[in-house]
UniProtKB/Swiss-Prot annotation:
Source superkingdom: Archaea
Cleavable signal peptide: none
Single GO term (MF): nickel cation binding
InterPro entries the UniProt entry points to: Ni-dep_hyd_lsu (IPR001501), NiFe-Hase_large (IPR029014)
Name by which UniProt lists this protein: Uncharacterized protein MJ0727
Xref: SUPFAM superfamilies: HydB/Nqo4-like
Organism annotation: Methanocaldococcus jannaschii (strain ATCC 43067 / DSM 2661 / JAL-1 / JCM 10045 / NBRC 100440) (Methanococcus jannaschii)
Amino acid sequence: MKIRGFESSMMGKDIDFIPPAMTRLCCLNEISHALAGVMAVEKAYNITVPNEGQYLREIARLGEIVEVDAIKLREFKNTDDLADIGNKIKSVLGKKAKYLAVGGVLENISDKRKEKLINLAKEGLNLVDKDFVKLVDERKAKIPLPDVELIDAYNFDANKVETNGLPKTALYDGKVVYSGSLARMYKEGLINSKNLWDVLSSRMIEIEFCLNKIIELLNKLKLTHPYMEPIIKDGKAIGEAVIEGGEGIVYHKVELLGREILDYTILTSENFNKAVLDSVDNDEAKRIIQLCERCYYL
């Protein structure tokens, strides 16, 4: 099923084409798209990834979230240094995730780099603005915006998605829903309001949350081999993966014949968030959500 158009370029390709292709799909979600694609293949063939590989992948994913949250806050605050820190952390998978592969991660980091990344994450924690949420609440009181329904990858059922138009907007269970930092931080219990203004607060809160998780995961690394050669079976197989990426939900579905890609489906948070913007039709809402045009239109 082709929701966006980019999927058609994947037909007939080998599964090794997924990471390099997906990292070029969107500069804000290069890890997320590549990871979701690789995980979909792993689901199709029940491939197990070593713990070390899982830790590295999660560190990169969280680093990308830090980067994207910081970039999306630039309209309201100087967060360039935080964006740079997130970018450096996500590079644990190499430039353009070149070490990401079906079966894990091809190369681990050194002990020296591990310590540098821990210090980098700690530096990021010192840059988190604890007063930012208060400033958002003040603006919320002056300029009212509606509450939104939320959807996250942890309670996601692809069968409940309805897509309309071309490029496609998406509803979930017949509702307009927001996917992204607010949904994630609401689920974590770190924010208790669903107002559109809270998207800004949730991004700053999430940066701190992710940096703490990154330090925790880096300390778990034993620097052993993070990759196991996968066994790709003959015959047809279907795999799906949904993760929380830099923007929000990233869903990939692959239909395979051995190593060959027969069909590919991609759905992103921006398919949902475009429906939110269409329903609100407000300039402030556009500044807050900052729809990723590339993820939506390509």
